[in-house]
């Protein structure tokens, strides 16, 4: 049986490492990238079944810019995305509603960066 492949793109290296470790313990094949540029490079050799994407990294729109690149690539435009941020509450934006209402995105879920592993697993199961 093939493992499901997941690419995690996040500039929080501690969260990146702990999420990778958790998902590997659940038998996923995991690659990571600390920004969207590295993430796009990783897609040249790693073809994930799902991408976990931080929305706000070096810039507030970096995650959305990555999504635009992904949408224009026939190999990845249907890849499910779990989008996350730890900033939604602090900036007062309902990111979940904003993201899940964008029809042009592939299958997409939003989760808060809370370290809630069950919420993450539930989102993964729903999208795969």
Question: Where do the language-model regions lie?
Answer:
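Acidic di-acidic motifs
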Residues: 10-11, 113
């Amino acid at each position: 049986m093939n493992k499901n492949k997941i690419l995690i793109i996040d500039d929080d290296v501690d969260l990146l490492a702990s999420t990778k470790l958790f998902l590997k313990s659940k038998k996923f094949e995991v690659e990571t990238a600390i920004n969207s540029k590295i993430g796009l490079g990783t897609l040249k050799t790693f073809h994930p079944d799902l991408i976990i994407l931080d929305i706000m990294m070096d810039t507030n729109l970096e995650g959305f810019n990555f999504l635009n690149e992904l949408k224009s690539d026939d190999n990845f435009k249907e890849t499910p995305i779990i989008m996350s941020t730890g900033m939604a509450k602090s900036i007062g934006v309902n990111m979940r509603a904003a993201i899940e209402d964008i029809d042009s995105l592939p299958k997409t879920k939003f989760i808060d960066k809370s370290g809630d592993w069950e919420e993450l697993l539930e989102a993964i199961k729903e999208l795969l």
